[in-house]
């Protein structure tokens, strides 16, 4: 099955009160694990590459070729979107689109709102004629991800409305208390703000920093308009724990596949668990 935009995918998720998981890839095995989990769960999925890891992964063309090849080799039948996570510049988003990414996030959240809107509008103008979906962010998701460190800044309602109406985006990441990386204590999401932003904007919301959030908060966030939830830290932790256990228990092991296969298997199980938590399992039948 060919890669798809996440636009219709998220519309259906929002209407059906479930969320599509975004899972970041870190190499070939991660892509295989994410796609395997999606196929086994019959769940639509968003495979993402963080802009800060694109060069590490070999570049935009390499990532697109890898994922497209895996769709064929693994006989994937579920809807899959390839997404640029936290696109740093307009040009980087355009490069991703030209390489075959079917969705991009332009992260102008660290800029004044006027600049954020201007950047987002330019990306949307380039993306929409090419059937590529666009996500934008308002406010700042705290924590650390791929070397980026930041504090939490709640999304402003008026700014959210402006970005949606003026830039015509497909999905909005409104920062409402979630963080990238491990949480210190239980997360406290801004549900009251979430409800108002969802009602005023009408677009599918995106929850960044979805790792480690209790199930009851995830469910509430979905009911209040979140149709996309990003997960990376839990997969990283599961992979690291599995590989660390192998290396600790067998000091003489050196075969790469023997060392890393348990890590890949741990990612598969983590992704499947999150898909069930997000109520996405079985939703691939609702074709996009």
Curated annotation (Swiss-Prot):
CDD domains: TBP_aldolase_IIB. Zn(2+) binds at residues 86, 180, 208. The active site is at 85 (proton donor). It catalyses: 6-phospho-5-dehydro-2-deoxy-D-gluconate = 3-oxopropanoate + dihydroxyacetone phosphate. SUPFAM superfamilies: Aldolase. Its cofactor is Zn(2+). Pathway: Polyol metabolism; myo-inositol degradation into acetyl-CoA; acetyl-CoA from myo-inositol: step 6/7. Dihydroxyacetone phosphate binds at residues 181, 209-211, 230-233. It comes from the Bacteria. One of its GO terms (biological process) is fructose 1,6-bisphosphate metabolic process. One of its GO terms (molecular function) is 5-dehydro-2-deoxyphosphogluconate aldolase activity. Transmembrane segments: none annotated. Keywords: Lyase, Metal-binding, Phosphoprotein, Zinc. Gene3D superfamilies: Aldolase class I. The modification Phosphothreonine is found at residue 233. PROSITE patterns: ALDOLASE_CLASS_II_1, ALDOLASE_CLASS_II_2. InterPro entries: Aldolase_TIM (IPR013785), Class_II_FBP_aldolase (IPR050246), FBA_II (IPR000771), Fruc_bis_ald_class-2 (IPR011289). The keyword Lyase applies. Its EC number is 4.1.2.29. Produces dihydroxyacetone phosphate (DHAP or glycerone phosphate) and malonic semialdehyde (MSA or 3-oxopropanoate) from 6-phospho-5-dehydro-2-deoxy-D-gluconate (DKGP). Belongs to the class II fructose-bisphosphate aldolase family. IolJ subfamily. This is 6-phospho-5-dehydro-2-deoxy-D-gluconate aldolase.
